[in-house]
Amino acid sequence: RIFTCAYAYRMTGDTKYLTKAETDMNAVCNFPDWNSKRHFLDVGEMATAVAFGYDWLYNELSAATRTKAANALLKFAFQQAQNKNWNLNFYEATNNWNQVCNGGLVCAALASYENNPSEAKDMIEKALESNKPALEVMYSPDGNYPEGSGYWCYGTLYQVLMLAALNSTLGTDNGLSDTP
């Protein structure tokens, strides 16, 4: 809902969407964690939502919400992605997990770069490194996707969000969109 409400607010200017997005951002940032130990895919989804709310609504969010969101991205996404105490196999995965987790981490890193530059840089570099080999498997030959159409839609959504965020923020996706 954060993504949808943030978009709706930007398109209409109706503050009910801003209020709902900010309420939801505060709610998820108050969670004790984003389920990283059991299902890192949840982290990718939460990081994406908070990142878009943070970025698209930044000037309208309260200072407390901005701080809470930046801290949550650091604690619940970046630090968990760097945690060596459990196996984060999405980095090597050649399925939707690679796209969703890396996509969420990259969107979060780009949105909150000023707050966490070292961690953000690490997230972006690791995602660029691990996403390209996955793309080479997932969409070849000729755009085929090994998990079927449902997961194609799910994984590709996060892939496109990541590519768009990289291009709009950095001016390049480092060649990912050229991957055969």
Q: Model-found features: residue ranges?
A:
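Aromatic-lined, polymer-binding surfaces characteristic
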Residues: 1-180
